[in-house]
């Protein structure tokens, strides 16, 4: 049954929204998905920006802080694997509304957390919504975007993630200094609630989804048919390793910078510069992907990232550190977002959210590991240079694996 469905998905172009020029509805959907990913970036990175203040207020050890970081990532993993695939059956729209409701509620309630255990619970539950949202936005963007520029638009939509992170970083230093870290969570929760009516009134399922969705076998076994099996393993491995490095950097840069002697405000801005690099790197990667191919552009970016991580220590004590952080954000986030585009291109409509959700979920396992390893390294007394050198290896391996992904499955 699935083989016949897959054949139809590959050959039927009459329902593809991407065979005609961009229409107003396509632009609207892309903007909505970009906004949702901005909120994702805000909700994920807010714990990183508030970590120095929370750690100081509660006297949290580096190891426990790493567990707090990872609790949200565990939730994102569970959401991506078990909730996001439901969008292939019930639709992208209801899942995105549910995700926004979960995120907004738990982010707001985090402002009332009084100890580490409660903080971990709220981070886990909010992570369920974040993991669901990211997979759904990538899937619906792939269905609406024109075929010739699909990779660019998927990458651009996911670029909302670092945009939200940067805006949060820019505002958080002042908000925390004047009103405390709790107020930042309150504002983030309210901002997330505001997107719910936008999703309800303006988000539309694609014609492609409505015609081909709700198959009986939109399940994980569909990702391991002979056509997809090897490429699925390669994609999962590349995402796992990329997320390991990415989430170490996103969560620990402000704290490591603070440990290195920077003021709390400058430490927060160092994380902002990292995410600013992503804002530039993601659309540039999308452009290069349309020109030179997904595999080549992503793989090379990952290899460059590994080199930058390896030589970071050469810039210690120099103002060039901020420049290197910018290009690290450019490379690691540009490449990992490109892997979302690979997943969106690799799997057909009937299993697209399932494929993207599981790929993100496997990546999130690396995202869980990265901050925990960071906590161990910091607890051992390692500084930024030594920690960055350690994480050069997963970026190197991820780059090599990406270059080996079968071109046939993403053509």
What are these regions (language model features)?
Residues 28-62, 249-254, 370:
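Extracytoplasmic
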Residues 47-48, 227-282:
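Extracytoplasmic gate region of multi-pass secondary transporters
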Residues 59, 91, 112-118, 146, ...:
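Helix-breaking motifs and short loop linkers at transmembrane-helix boundaries and internal kinks
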Residues 78-116:
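Conserved MFS/SLC helix-loop-helix module at the cytosolic interface between two early adjacent transmembrane helices
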Residues 106, 117-125, 319-327:
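Paired small-residue
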Residues 122-159:
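Cytoplasmic helix-loop-helix junction between adjacent transmembrane helices
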Residues 157-201:
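Helix-loop-helix hairpin linking two adjacent transmembrane segments in secondary transporters
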Residues 289-339:
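C-terminal transmembrane helical hairpin of 12-TM major facilitator-type secondary transporters
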